[in-house]
């Protein structure tokens, strides 16, 4: 007696497996990345329901046509005023799901292949400026003896030394820092749960040692740069403290007053200063946590 072929999984079952099994368990993506994928799907499913007149539970893979995807992307830009970067990020989430679905439902390969043909939208990346060494040192400044001043000094030194993203810096715990003179470094936890170790300069080592002497209650699991409640600093607080430091630095470097200095500009400054010092681009890519030197270029 011939065995009956197993029916292909339903669209809702595929979506559930994509989030529960693929993203969370198999790829072990960070909660923030999974949340970005979830938001993209919520928007897409809401758009599909309005356009097709069917609830998400009634959708099938053949419903996910290039026309539907293109209409959704146009809706994001036109009606929701999403940037091209956000539009492409949401398309990437859909493409990731479709590639996953192709392994679970081979009967829909042709449909999926057509849908995967929707291209990302090209856009001009704005040229990002950077600070001179004099300007960067002025922003870092000299701590005035207060707790906040000393913490902010370490924060700004760490941002410049490591070229790290804000999320990586505020996530650093005391135990992530190695202060041995011969092999001083900080272990950063980056995007997609990737980890890397970045060497620490002597000035950074001295500042961290002074900070830890001032804060003996900090243990290996404590945030290196806490707020007054002992919790990790927020992104907003980092932006606020950087803005304050730039205002103070503008007294000695007046040109800073007219510039918007962001943590990402400091990251770019780190890359440019390393490049000017003769460091190879491939090393700078590892320093910044780029997957490819092409990104660093």
Across the structure, where does each feature detected by a protein language model lie?
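Conserved catalytic core of the tyrosine transesterase superfamily
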Residues: 1-297
